[in-house]
Amino acid sequence: MDYKETLILPDTSFPMRGNLPANEPHTYAKWRDEKLYSKLKNAHSGAKNFCLHDGPPYANGHLHIGHALNKILKDIIVKYHYFKGENIRYTPGWDCHGLPIEQQVEQKIGKAKKDNLNKTKLRELCRNHAQKFIQIQSDEFQALGVLGDFENPYKTMDFAFEAQIYRSLIELVKEGLLAERSKPIYWSWACETALADAEVEYQDKQSDSIFVAFTLSDSALQSLGISQGKVIIWTTTPWTLPANVGIALNPSESYVLTDKGYIVAKALLEKVCENIDIGISKREFKAQEFERLEAINPLNGRTSLIVLGEHVSINDGTGAVHTAPGHGEDDYYIGLKYGLEVIMPVDDRGNFSPLIESMGLVPKEFANEFVGKNIFDTHESIFKILGKALLKQDVITHSYPHCWRSHKPVIYRATAQWFILLDKPFYQGKTLKELALEELDKVRFYPQNGKNRIYSMIENRPDWCISRQRDWGVPIAFLIDKITNVALLDEAVLEHIACIFEKEGCDAWWSYEIKDLLPPSHKHLAENLTKSKHILDVWFDSGSTWSAVLENEYKGAGNNYDAGSHPADMYLEGSDQHRGWFQSSLLLSCAIAKRAPYKQILTHGFTFDRNGEKMSKSKGNVISPSEIIKTQGSEILRLWVALSHYQSDQNISDEILKQVGEQYRKIRNTIRFLLANASQNSQDMVEKDELDVIDRWILSVCDRVFDEAYEYFDEYEFAKAFQVVMSFLINELSGIYLDLCKDILYCDDVSSLRRRAIQSALVMILRRVLHFIAPVLTYTADEAFRHSSAALKGEYESIFDLPKLSCAQGYNLEINEDFTRLLRVREKFTESLDNLKKQKIVKSSLEVLLQSPQEKEFALLDRWLIVSGVCGKECKDKEELARFMLEDKEEFVIYRAQNGRCERCWQFIVEESEGKLCKRCTSVIAQTKK
């Protein structure tokens, strides 16, 4: 007889292979058809809310692996809160304005055609480009298994959204937090236009390199207690010296006065002496001793304030940087800190204006050598005026920014820009900066050091320049008085314009006549007004998303999103957003709503190849999410995210994904075994107190492990959660429990109590496993649930209905036995058995008996160690194979089993009189025949 046919072997329709690339799209289509996200939104109404507000990706290009990491993390967290029983909201969004889209349009139609287009047509082309990639990216995000309100996403270019961005600007006007002032930007004097960073390319350029001595003022000499002192500066832009108002020193450095009266950074003294003989060190000072003292500009005799700046390099130069806030970004920001004057004597064409004469920026007798002359053509005149203060002049070749259109060198030039004031008291005597820092103290950060990053950035940041000189964006729609050049900030006018934007979008700013932008009460002013040419910084757009998307008192009509309330429970982005979206959102929310827009901030690192290098097409090391999905399935990518310590930078490669695939197969195979052996119907489940002690042990371990894992989930430490769960699945569950249950599952009668007890335990474990993996391996959990028995499903229709159930809720898990000791017994026994196998003395644990000193655990050890029997002293006449001892000196002896092997269960327990089968197997077969 073939006894194999009498065994109850595992049986499940759940396939061993997931065939994920083929099956995932069908499952997602089913979810979409069922309007699953809408169901999830409504499933826990009335419960605790959890709203993750989506940081909008840019609507340009396909997704890269960083996008995948970000969106999968968000999806895991939203789903985790859903499976916790919370009322979740997640509305995806897109950032639609900005220079990259303008560039793409120009590349497509050509610069000449773009320059001849009217603004409305150009913006239409930009809008179409953005919409195209929103659809592409939406499909790609959903292919990652991400659930959200993709039917009603937010787009910053929607008319109502543009109106809301503009209304945020109006709120700042009301708070008195806007100011117009000059700020240096890249300027192409050859094209007479401002340039964005992306429009600047670096080329080698020959420049004059000069060392100039600024004599300290009498009061400065007195303060320092010295009789003479000249601070040496080094610059490669001599034409900026007329606009000098300061000298910046590095606050972390020491400075020396030489015996010849010159002052340079101590660290650079030797290097400077290679160029100029300035003598040897005579006295040393801390940089702070010079702060706010004055020196004299030798070009024009004007005072130059000594300031401290972290930007001052100690790698080259003198450690003292000539500072002209109108001609440099670092100079400008340090100027804001110290209140330095912004002087701009250069016109649109790169020529010195009459201002250079009227302000006395050069000696009057030399003015005609400057006014109307190109700045680069005035160096010889500058050298002549400097005289002996010019310590050395040379020519160097260095990398210098050039205009991408004219290929001429660009300059930094201060122009009128709009700013949000951070240091002006506006609310309960607090400045915006103070309020923002105060609100940050209420925010929970993951990781915690993220708080220090954004805190120090805001603490040290200057006022926020929100104006840009581009076409594709939300206009700073202010009407300017032609005579006074002052903006008309009347609330009725601003609100009237906002209403127009709400209906027709902000393209109306360019297409409408000024009179049509004014309310009836102000139309008489039209002839005296002109339109501002600025648009808003795109960070203002994304920083306003909370006001347009989340429920709040400032939300305008037309922004109909069911996305949760302000403040959001979480913002989650890459660590670079401490400088970006987290900061812009915080500042605008504090300015308008007087509170932070988020309760928690979670950040992740960046993704690199296996060698830690940045991915690029030229290196051939790009790993595309779409390729992974096509070849391996998004589940592998999702598990990679969950297993990664994502708060740091992450590496990804085919080899790493292969390792992740192996982890996935372990999880899938465990689920498959559980499905194949668990109870089929609820009536097969045993009663609360009918579990065997080993079943109670595994369920108590299961509860402990998953409770610990959920604690890690609560802190968003998914890798640690999976580590403890994987250890349980591999060691306690598969390595011990499932192994020792196989005999009962396969060989006992189908209705035996102990078999049904194991099957009941497997149902409880499977529920916990599926509930745990569902936020991460949603496709797999969904598939497994569909292949589950009625016993597991119970009253639930889908995996998304499955609640978090502990094993202790279903069964009495009280244990009196010492399983810590039993695990040590098993460990020692396994070591001895492995040695016996290596020596080819036995092939299986079923070939041995064990002598135990404690009679009460004979029956337990029999099953626990998968041996053919446990005995006391009566075993001594058997063939001894090995012995082992516990730490407490308890000794166990391993003997060879003497009885015959049962041909059905393979245990060596058949007496000579019993034939080929043991008593249990004989009884089961007899029952089967009935």
Swiss-Prot record:
Q: Which GO terms describe its biological process?
A: isoleucyl-tRNA aminoacylation
One Gene Ontology cellular component annotation held by this UniProt entry: cytosol
> What does the entry's cofactor note say about binding and number?
Binds 1 zinc ion per subunit.
Q: Do the record's keywords include Zinc?
A: yes
- Cross-referenced SUPFAM superfamilies, in alphabetical order? Anticodon-binding domain of a subclass of class I aminoacyl-tRNA synthetases (SSF47323), Nucleotidylyl transferase (SSF52374), ValRS/IleRS/LeuRS editing domain (SSF50677)
Q: Which cofactor does it need?
A: Zn(2+)
The record's listing under Pfam families reads: Anticodon_1, tRNA-synt_1
Q: For this UniProt entry, what is the primary localization, expressed as one broad class?
A: cytoplasm
Residues where L-isoleucyl-5'-AMP binds = E573
| Catalytic reactions on record | tRNA(Ile) + L-isoleucine + ATP = L-isoleucyl-tRNA(Ile) + AMP + diphosphate
Q: Which residues bind ATP?
A: K617
Q: Where does Zn(2+) bind?
A: C902, C905, C918, C921
Residue ranges of the motif 'KMSKS' region:
614-618
Signal peptide residues on this chain, from the entry's feature table: none
List the keywords (alphabetical).
Aminoacyl-tRNA synthetase, ATP-binding, Cytoplasm, Ligase, Metal-binding, Nucleotide-binding, Protein biosynthesis, Zinc
Cite the InterPro entries for this sequence.
Answer: aa-tRNA-synth_I_CS, aa-tRNA-synth_Ia, Anticodon_Ile_BEm, Ile-tRNA-ligase, Ile-tRNA-ligase_type1, Ile-tRNA_ligase, M/V/L/I-tRNA-synth_anticd-bd, Rossmann-like_a/b/a_fold
Question: What is its biological role?
Answer: Catalyzes the attachment of isoleucine to tRNA(Ile). As IleRS can inadvertently accommodate and process structurally similar amino acids such as valine, to avoid such errors it has two additional distinct tRNA(Ile)-dependent editing activities. One activity is designated as 'pretransfer' editing and involves the hydrolysis of activated Val-AMP. The other activity is designated 'posttransfer' editing and involves deacylation of mischarged Val-tRNA(Ile).
User: What does the UniProt entry state concerning the protein's domains?
Assistant: IleRS has two distinct active sites: one for aminoacylation and one for editing. The misactivated valine is translocated from the active site to the editing site, which sterically excludes the correctly activated isoleucine. The single editing site contains two valyl binding pockets, one specific for each substrate (Val-AMP or Val-tRNA(Ile)).
Q: How does it assemble?
A: Monomer.
Protein name as it appears in the record: Isoleucine--tRNA ligase
Species of origin: Helicobacter hepaticus (strain ATCC 51449 / 3B1)
